[in-house]
């Protein structure tokens, strides 16, 4: 929580106003933030100064792992995070590549599980990483990359957190995740959970011990219609004791994650939090 609150305060105190063309709103912005999560010691980075819906964050990550491209599939997992971008984004609604209601296009997990090759085939990036790590192999390129400029026009949104680089030191697994842009009041609590959980679950299914997860954010911002709530409400609250995160030990493979795993296979103990804050969302 400390590093999260320090970033929020830094944006409020030192941020520069930037006009965002996509949303038509101004953002108070800083460049570069580095967060570290101690997965080895189960220091779960869940926000306590407002209620954080961690299950939706895990459900979204699970959808990425499965390569989903439809908001309905994400809803079935337990999150509505893609409803607006799939169905309320004017540019996407008028895009000839959109297949209909709830279609997201070739975003995030689609790129991770089926990156298009010039010859017409596909690359399953995640499968390759899991196979390598399971065998104890780190070729210095165990990178899951969602950022494919050649197909931006085929999706409803460019990826924000676009790269996850796994590294082995002995039998300990590390993760470096890079995020080009972050809506800090709304998105960062999700993203912190996802980086932490991604390392934890990948270590479990590859038979490795989790180490630290390193989370780099390039453009961290607070939208102008979120600023008062962040400055005058959330930042005035005292953080509470961090909870612990748990994964069903029966999850042992990528195939398990692709088939039978649900949100019931993840749980949090000791989560105390302040009241929710309804931050505005910008499509």
Swiss-Prot record:
Subunit text? Homodimer.
Kindly list the biological process annotations in GO that this record carries.
dTMP biosynthetic process; dTTP biosynthetic process; methylation
Q: Where in the cell is it found?
A: Cytoplasm
Q: Which family does it belong to?
A: Belongs to the thymidylate synthase family. Bacterial-type ThyA subfamily.
Positions annotated as active site in the UniProt record: 160 (nucleophile)
Q: What is the main EC category here?
A: transferase
Protein's gene: thyA
The name this protein carries in UniProt is: Thymidylate synthase
Q: What does this protein do?
A: Catalyzes the reductive methylation of 2'-deoxyuridine-5'-monophosphate (dUMP) to 2'-deoxythymidine-5'-monophosphate (dTMP) while utilizing 5,10-methylenetetrahydrofolate (mTHF) as the methyl donor and reductant in the reaction, yielding dihydrofolate (DHF) as a by-product. This enzymatic reaction provides an intracellular de novo source of dTMP, an essential precursor for DNA biosynthesis.
């Amino acid at each position: 929580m400390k590093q999260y609150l320090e970033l929020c305060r830094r944006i409020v105190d030192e941020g520069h106003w930037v006009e965002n063309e996509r949303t038509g709103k101004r953002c108070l912005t800083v460049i570069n933030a580095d967060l570290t999560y101690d997965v080895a010691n189960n220091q779960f980075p869940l926000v306590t100064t407002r209620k954080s819906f961690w299950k939706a964050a895990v459900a979204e990550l699970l959808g990425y792992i499965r390569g989903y491209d439809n908001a309905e599939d994400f809803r079935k997992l337990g999150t509505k995070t893609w409803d607006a971008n799939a169905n309320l984004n004017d540019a996407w609604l008028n895009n000839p590549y959109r297949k209909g209601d709830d279609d997201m296009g070739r975003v995030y997990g689609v790129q991770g599980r089926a990156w298009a090759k010039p010859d017409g085939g596909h690359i399953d990036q995640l499968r390759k990483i899991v196979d390598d790590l399971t065998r104890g192999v780190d070729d210095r390129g165990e990178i899951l990359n969602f950022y494919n400029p050649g197909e931006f026009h085929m999706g409803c949104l460019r990826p924000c957190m676009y790269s996850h680089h796994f590294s082995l030191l002995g039998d300990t697994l590390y993760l470096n995740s890079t995020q080009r842009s972050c809506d800090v009041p709304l998105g960062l609590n999700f993203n912190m959970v996802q980086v932490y959980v991604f390392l934890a679950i990948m270590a479990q299914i590859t038979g490795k011990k989790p180490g630290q997860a390193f989370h780099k954010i390039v453009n961290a911002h607070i939208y102008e219609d979120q600023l008062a709530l962040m400055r005058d409400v959330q930042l005035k609250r005292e953080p509470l004791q961090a909870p612990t995160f748990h994964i069903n030990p029966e999850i042992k493979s990528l195939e398990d994650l692709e088939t039978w795993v649900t949100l019931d296979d993840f749980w949090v103990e000791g989560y105390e939090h302040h009241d929710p804050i309804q931050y505005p969302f910008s499509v």
